[in-house]
Amino acid sequence: MHKKSSTLIRKREISDVTKESKVVLKSDQQWREQLSEQEYHVCREQGTEPPFSGKLLHNKDSGEYACTCCHAPLFSSVNKYDSGCGWPSFDAPINETAVLYLDDFSHGMKRVEIRCARCDSHLGHVFPDGPKTTGERFCVNSVSLIFNKIETNE
């Protein structure tokens, strides 16, 4: 279970990520030029795509889900499952340093927001109602992900 939800811990994690990998820092204008309007709204303004509308919701191919903004690996198809919530769901990130956790008190709720550790892009939220494997449900906007299919010899 994650316990990484305070701003102080998040700042420390960003510092740790900086030491281990290249953090992507861009101006607001650069993000606007790179991303579509919907990608910008979700990834940079913490928006949410409508449920059951995402292109990756029903994807069952084997591969890796990466950040739309910086292409950092975030989730594996091995961890994807159908939670019925209307957004792609995973029981864990691809590794412990792929995502950041941040308390989110918006809309009168207490949730835990997840962001890309490399570029600080909004991905979605994590909830403690996932499958028995981890008990967590990483609920992610499709628009915040790109899918890299693993080619098989089948």
From Swiss-Prot:
The gene is msrB. Its cofactor is Zn(2+). One of its GO terms (cellular component) is cytoplasm. The keyword Transmembrane does not apply. Belongs to the MsrB Met sulfoxide reductase family. HAMAP family: MsrB. It comes from the Bacteria. Binds 1 zinc ion per subunit. The zinc ion is important for the structural integrity of the protein. The lineage of its organism: Bacteria, Pseudomonadati, Pseudomonadota, Gammaproteobacteria, Vibrionales. GO terms for molecular function: peptide-methionine (R)-S-oxide reductase activity; zinc ion binding. Keywords: Metal-binding, Oxidoreductase, Zinc. Residues 28-150 form the MsrB domain. It catalyses: L-methionyl-[protein] + [thioredoxin]-disulfide + H2O = L-methionyl-(R)-S-oxide-[protein] + [thioredoxin]-dithiol. The active site is at C139 (nucleophile). Zn(2+) binds at C67, C70, C116, C119. GO terms for biological process: protein repair; response to oxidative stress. This is Peptide methionine sulfoxide reductase MsrB. It comes from Vibrio vulnificus (strain CMCP6). The keyword Zinc applies. Its EC number is 1.8.4.12.
